[in-house]
Regions:
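Flexible hinge/capping segments at coil-to-helix
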Residues: 183, 194-211
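A bilobed periplasmic-binding-protein/Venus flytrap-type ligand-binding module shared by bacterial periplasmic
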Residues: 36-59, 190-202, 265
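A ligand-binding cleft/hinge motif common to bilobed small-molecule-binding domains
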Residues: 22-39, 156, 167-178, 223-225, ...
Length: 266
């Protein structure tokens, strides 16, 4: 009888462990799928209205585009070349006023937008934008200091002098009247993403549902597609990792993300 009890206890324990392990595994293997593209945009760099820095940065980026450096970084971080900046060798030499070396600029960036821009454990920043900014700094003989800001507050941050420019995964379309923008340097689409096991297969099927976003550009994409009037509510999350965690947990029904980084999270 004792042997039978021990055997039954062993079987019960083994079954419980199996259920726990398979339960954990199911959470770890959650997958996602894109069901719609909402809009297209081009990422820009934002400056104070009329600031000559805009022309200087644009010229430096045109030279880096001509050198193939932007294409290289795009392929390295995103797997595809999404570059749209004009390639113009010697663009800096065409400026009426040449940039003086030795300047130190404060650049407003986003955090938590891997692999575009995110902080490391040591407090430094890594990703496509910081690497490209470093190439611009080397070309101009300048140094850059990065400051994390909210992409919805770009005009205010520039106007206060807190930053010299804002370099983010954003088109700044909502701020174009109050800031100067470089030409677009990277193409992007906003995508609507759901869990792969979701019953939602089209954007129209999300009527009355909860959509997760990270910033105003994603909200603009919802408005441009006409979805803002159909969904139940829109919830803001701190970054894309938080967005996907909420989607995986079922806290929201879909998320709007930048298509260029979808492969990193999906």
């Amino acid at each position: 009888m004792k042997k039978l009890r021990r055997f039954l206890a062993f079987v019960l324990c083994a079954a419980l462990c199996f259920l726990l392990l398979t339960g954990c595994g199911s959470r770890d293997t959650i997958r996602f799928k894109m069901i719609a593209e909402l809009n297209q945009e081009e990422f820009c760099v934002a400056f104070r209205k009329g600031d000559p820095l805009c022309d200087i940065f644009t010229a430096a980026l045109k030279e880096l585009s001509a050198d193939g450096q932007i294409s290289r970084l795009s392929a390295q971080y995103l797997g595809t070349d999404y570059t749209c900046m004009e390639a113009l060798p010697g663009a800096l030499q065409l400026l009426e006023t040449q940039p003086e070396p030795g300047r130190k600029l404060r650049i407003g960036v986003q955090d938590g937008i891997a692999p575009i821009s995110s902080s490391r454990d040591d407090g430094s920043f890594g990703g496509l934008i910081p690497d490209l900014a470093q190439l611009v700094a080397e070309k101009l003989g300048w140094t850059f200091e990065y400051m994390v800001i909210n992409s919805d507050n770009v005009a205010a941050e520039l106007g206060s002098g807190n930053i010299d420019c804002a370099w983010m995964a954003a088109s700044f379309s909502g701020s174009s009247s109050s800031v100067s923008l470089s030409p677009g340097w990277l193409r992007n689409t906003h995508e609507l993403v759901v869990r792969s096991d979701s019953r939602y297969a089209r954007k129209n099927s999300l009527k009355g549902k909860v959509i997760g976003i990270t910033d105003a550009t994603a909200l603009s994409a919802l408005k441009e597609s006409g979805m803002d009037a159909k969904v139940g509510s829109v919830w803001y999350y701190d970054d894309l990792s938080a967005c996907f965690a909420a989607l995986a947990a079922g806290d929201c029904d879909a998320v709007v993300i930048d298509g260029i980084v979808s492969g990193y999270y999906m």
